[in-house]
C-alpha cells in the first residue's frame, strides 16, 4: 500500500498516514509513503517511494536504514539501472497506458517496460492507466505486479473490483 497525496498539507498528511499505517499493520500489509521521508520515519512506515525529481535512492537509504523498502519511479533502462545501483528495492515503471491520475506522466512502450525488467534484478511494478480491460496486455513484459488507483477506487464495489483485478493480474504474471 502506498500513500501518495500531493494536495494535503504536512499536518493532514501525517494524520492520514497514521490512520493508514494502523490499518496496514492490522492486516500485515507493507505501507510505503510517497516522497516524504520525514513522515515515513515519524510513523515508522515500511518504506518510501521516490520519483526521478525527488530525493535520490541512496540518500533515502542513508536516512531510513537497511531494513526499509525503497521504491523508485523509472521510465528508462538507464534510470532503472541507476536506481538499482543506488539501493532501490523495487521500481515503479510507467505510465504503461494513458492515465488521468497523474497529469505529467509520460507513456512508455511495453517494449521499454520489458527492456527494464530484463536489465534489472529487482522487482518491477507497472503503473499508469492499468485496468481490468487492459492488464492482460502486460503479459510477457516480466513485471511482477501492478499499481493502480482508478481501476479500483473509481468503481462502485471497490472490494469486488480489487478481487477481480488481483485475479487477472496473477493470471497475467504467471502466463
Task: Locate the predicted segments by residue.
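Conserved beta-strand positions in the central sheet of alpha/beta enzyme cores
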Residues: 2, 32, 49, 71, ...
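Glycine-rich, proline-tolerant flexible connector loops at the mouths of alpha/beta enzymes
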Residues: 2-12, 95-102
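Alpha-helix-loop-beta-strand connector modules within alpha/beta enzyme cores
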Residues: 13-35, 52, 57-75, 104-132, ...
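Alpha/beta enzyme core
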Residues: 26, 36-39, 43-46, 63, ...
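Glycine/Thr-rich beta-alpha phosphate-binding loop at enzyme active sites
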Residues: 43-45, 50, 73-114, 118, ...
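Glycine-rich phosphate-binding active-site loops on the catalytic face of alpha/beta enzymes
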Residues: 52-60, 92-104, 132-135, 139-165
Amino acid at each position: 500500500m502506498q500513500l501518495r497525496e500531493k494536495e494535503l498539507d504536512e499536518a493532514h498528511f501525517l494524520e492520514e498516514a497514521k490512520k493508514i499505517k494502523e490499518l496496514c499493520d492490522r492486516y500485515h500489509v507493507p505501507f510505503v509513503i510517497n516522497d516524504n521521508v520525514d513522515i515515513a520515519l515519524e510513523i515508522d512506515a515500511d518504506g518510501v517511494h521516490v520519483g526521478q525529481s525527488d530525493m535520490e535512492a541512496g540518500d533515502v537509504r542513508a536516512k531510513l536504514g537497511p531494513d526499509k523498502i525503497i521504491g523508485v519511479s523509472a521510465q528508462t533502462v538507464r534510470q532503472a539501472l541507476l536506481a538499482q545501483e543506488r539501493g532501490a528495492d523495487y521500481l515503479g515503471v510507467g505510465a504503461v497506458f494513458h492515465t488521468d491520475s497523474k497529469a505529467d506522466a509520460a507513456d512508455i512502450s511495453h517494449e521499454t517496460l520489458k527492456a527494464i525488467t530484463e536489465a534489472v534484478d529487482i522487482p518491477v511494478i507497472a503503473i499508469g492507466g492499468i485496468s481490468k480491460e487492459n492488464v492482460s496486455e502486460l503479459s510477457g513484459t516480466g513485471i511482477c505486479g501492478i499499481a493502480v488507483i482508478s481501476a479500483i477506487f473509481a468503481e462502485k464495489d471497490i472490494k469486488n473490483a480489487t478481487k477481480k483485478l488481483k485475479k487477472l493480474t496473477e493470471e497475467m504474471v504467471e502466463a
